[in-house]
Amino acid sequence: SLILLVAVQALTEEDLQLLRQTSAECKTESGASEAVIKKARKGDLEDDPKLKMQLLCIFKALEIVAESGEIEADTFKEKLTRVTNDDEESEKIVEKCTVTEDTPEDTAFEVTKCVLKDKPNFFGDLFV
């Protein structure tokens, strides 16, 4: 997809390796099933506690979510801009999608759902 192509071009090979490694480590930590992760890659997020843990783990590793569970808006925008190559678009997504839910896991899940509404292929196989 175009979005994934842009993501690959905007991120260095080192970035991609780190994301894949982080995703693998988080999968081990969260226990999320491969089936649920495959669906998530396609933009189909199941309301699954292990998937939520997976997303939170990745967001923490990318420093998008603080230890407190709150979204780090500046870091979130910076990471998005590296993928979108569009500062204005990233700003709009951050403003719209920076939410705080009852738990850090729910926050990561809802942020992901929000981003995927506008960009269904945004995360591709890089982030989950």
Curated annotation (Swiss-Prot):
Matching SMART domains: PhBP
GO cellular component terms, semicolon-separated: extracellular space
Protein modification: N-glycosylated.
GO molecular function, a single term: odorant binding
Record's subcellular location: Secreted
InterPro entries recorded: PBP/GOBP (IPR006170), PBP_GOBP_sf (IPR036728)
Source domain of life: Eukaryota
GO biological process terms, semicolon-separated: sensory perception of smell
Signal sequence, renumbered to the chain: 1-10
Disulfide-bonded cysteines: 26-57, 97-114
Keywords, sorted A to Z: Disulfide bond, Glycoprotein, Secreted, Signal
Free-text tissue specificity from the UniProt record: Tubular accessory sex gland.
Keyword match DNA-binding: no
Membership in a protein family: Belongs to the PBP/GOBP family.
UniProt xrefs under PANTHER family: GEO07291P1-RELATED, ODORANT BINDING PROTEIN-RELATED
Protein name in UniProt: B2 protein
